[in-house]
Regions:
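Short aromatic-acidic-glycine turn motif
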Residues: 115-129
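Residue-level preference for beta-strand/loop junctions
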Residues: 90, 108, 146-148, 164
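A beta-strand/beta-hairpin structural motif
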Residues: 125-161
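Surface beta-strand/loop "capping" patches
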Residues: 66-119
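Catalytic cores of secreted or luminal carbohydrate-active enzymes
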Residues: 32-82
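Composition- and surface-driven signal marking solvent-exposed, interaction-prone regions
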Residues: 59-64, 108-113, 167-169
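Catalytic-core regions of glycoside hydrolase
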Residues: 1-53
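Short glycine/proline/serine/threonine-rich loop/turn segments at secondary-structure transition edges
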Residues: 159-169
Length: 170
């Protein structure tokens, strides 16, 4: 019935609920591989467990580990580079590459955020690049997520020069 999910998963999360594990196993019907395939086919964002969780995890560990690497959205910053030093008032660029390794989009979206700290670990600046909405990153088959390059240019503590009295002080 995964064709029905094709109507919904691009716009809203899909929740999977499987048969009671122990009962299905007792009848000889359980197949962990089908569970993994269902996450892919339905583009599942959530899955409920119907059995004793520790028992199901112990007996289906490999399949559950594979599911956990794919279910929902999996935003990855695949690489990043930045200057060794940044000066106040001067522009600098952070180069990064982003992908979604999950089966579903990040429905609400969001934007990459970078936090710069000083040598003592104190926060100097929190910077957001609103040119990439991570909700637009495509989903793909396992190990085939496409990477999107992003060049984010920021200036910390830019100097403001009042020209023509456009700056209002209260």
């Amino acid at each position: 019935h995964d064709e029905m999910a094709q109507l919904f998963w691009p716009a809203m999360p899909v929740v999977l609920e499987h048969e009671h594990y122990g009962l299905s196993k007792k009848r000889g019907n359980w197949d962990s591989e089908l569970l993994v395939e269902s996450v892919e086919a339905y583009h599942a964002s959530y899955m409920s467990i119907h059995w004793w969780p520790r028992e199901e995890l112990a007996e289906c560990r490999e399949a559950i580990d594979r599911i956990n690497r794919r279910i929902g959205y999996r935003l990855r910053m695949d690489n990043a580079s930045w200057p060794q030093k940044v000066a106040l008032g001067e522009a600098f660029t952070i180069e990064s590459a982003w992908s979604n390794a999950g089966v579903a989009p990040c429905y609400k979206g969001g934007f990459p955020c970078f936090t710069l700290k000083d040598a003592r670990g104190g926060i100097v600046s929190v910077l957001v690049d609103d040119s990439l909405d991570v909700g637009t990153l495509p989903v793909a088959a396992p190990e085939q997520a496409s990477t999107l390059a992003l060049a984010s240019t920021f200036t910390i503590a830019p100097r403001f020069t009042e020209r023509g009295h456009c700056f209002f002080r209260a």
